[in-house]
C-alpha cells in the first residue's frame, strides 16, 4: 500500500484546520534514527484503505520523492463524523 505525502511547513491549529478543509489531514512520522517529520495526507485516499487489514501492517509513504516504510501507531477520529483528524506513523 502506497500513499503520497507532503511535508507540512505550517504548524498549529489554524494550519491543521485549513488542511482539513482542503481534503487533507495532518500526520507525523517518527521513530528510528531520523528526526520526526510532520506531513499532510489526502483524506479520501487513506480513509478508503483503512478498512483493509493490510493498512495496519506496513505502508509505504512517499514523502517528497523519498519512500519510507511505516506502520500506523495512532489514529485520532472525529467524534461523530467518519473523518480522520490526525495520524501517527512509526518507521519500520
From Swiss-Prot:
Keyword field contains Lipid biosynthesis: no
| Lineage: superkingdom | Bacteria
- Keywords (A to Z) from UniProt: Ribonucleoprotein, Ribosomal protein, RNA-binding, rRNA-binding
Q: Can the keyword RNA-binding be found in this entry's annotation?
A: yes
What are its GO biological-process terms?
translation
Cited Gene3D superfamilies: Ribosomal Protein L25, Chain P
Its subunit composition reads: Part of the 50S ribosomal subunit; part of the 5S rRNA/L5/L18/L25 subcomplex. Contacts the 5S rRNA. Binds to the 5S rRNA independently of L5 and L18.
Role summary: This is one of the proteins that binds to the 5S RNA in the ribosome where it forms part of the central protuberance.
Regarding protein family, the annotation reads:
Belongs to the bacterial ribosomal protein bL25 family.
The identity of this protein, by name, is Large ribosomal subunit protein bL25
Amino acid at each position: 500500500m502506497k500513499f503520497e505525502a507532503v511535508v507540512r511547513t505550517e504548524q498549529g491549529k489554524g494550519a491543521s484546520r485549513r488542511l482539513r478543509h482542503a481534503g487533507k489531514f495532518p500526520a507525523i512520522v517518527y521513530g528510528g534514527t531520523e528526526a520526526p517529520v510532520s506531513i499532510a495526507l489526502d483524506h479520501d485516499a487513506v480513509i478508503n484503505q483503512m478498512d483493509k487489514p493490510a493498512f495496519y501492517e506496513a505502508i509505504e509513504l512517499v514523502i517528497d520523492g523519498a519512500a519510507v516504510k511505516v506502520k500506523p501507531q495512532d489514529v485520532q477520529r472525529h467524534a461523530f463524523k467518519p473523518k480522520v483528524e490526525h495520524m501517527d506513523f512509526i518507521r519500520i
